[in-house]
Amino acid sequence: MAFKRISRHGIGNLTNRRGGADHRAGQDNGDGPGVSVNTGDRQETGRPRLHCTVVLVGMMGCGKSAIGRTLAARLGVAFVDSDAEIETAANATIPEIFARDGEAFFRAREAEVIARLLRGEPCVLSTGGGAFLADRNRQAIAEHGVAIWLDADLDLLWDRVRHKDTRPLLRTPDPKMTLARLLEDRAPIYAQAELRARAEPGLSIDAMTERVIAILADRPDILEIPDDS
């Protein structure tokens, strides 16, 4: 199957470089650090500055896409979903790719897309549930970005995915048991992510985004928040 190369506006061919800030990040005032505005190749002075791509990893249903969009808007950077990139390039949905070409084909394309996006400008990147399992993806993320695991328990994940038929790996006679086994197998690998944010029932998208920002703000080499923001 032909798989065309595509690019997204705002994610060019610049190489990510993690900034070497030597001062502490400012404190959150309760409303978060504000929204940064992109002006060409860099963010406005006095606003939060993202030094590398933030890669959201975790199980299906943990909130990567929803949190990713909100986080990107707050930081004034692009949001990219690796699954959506693959679907656009392949002109097919993820379930269709799995059924037609197999998981191995999908994983290879996934690795290509993630590597390309990591070479672009700092952004927020949401990845598929299996992406972080591949050693080559973990290595690429460690070199060019930072991974943050959105850690959710089985009941929360099941509540979010049980009514959806867009998860190829859950098309089994007992999808909840399948989900439980996937979580058990994958959690030790997700735990290798550099950062971790615990997802909890009842926590809104905005509240979860605040939690992620607070974690990132503890690392000024990743996210700088000026004292006056």
Regions found by a protein language model. Give the residues of each.
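A glycine- and Lys/Arg-enriched "phosphate-lid" helix/loop adjacent to the NTP-binding pocket
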Residues: 143-188
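Hydrophobic positions on the alpha1 helix immediately C-terminal to the Walker A/P-loop
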Residues: 67
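Short glycine-rich anion-binding loops that position phosphate/pyrophosphate groups of nucleotides
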Residues: 129-131, 153-155, 202-203
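Hydrophobic anchor at the beta1->P-loop junction of P-loop NTPases
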Residues: 56
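ATP-dependent small-molecule kinase phosphotransfer cores
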Residues: 81-142, 166-167
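P-loop (Walker A) phosphate-binding loop of NTP-binding proteins
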Residues: 59
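NTP-dependent small-molecule kinase module
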Residues: 2-18, 23-24, 33-49, 70, ...
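Conserved lysine of the Walker
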Residues: 64
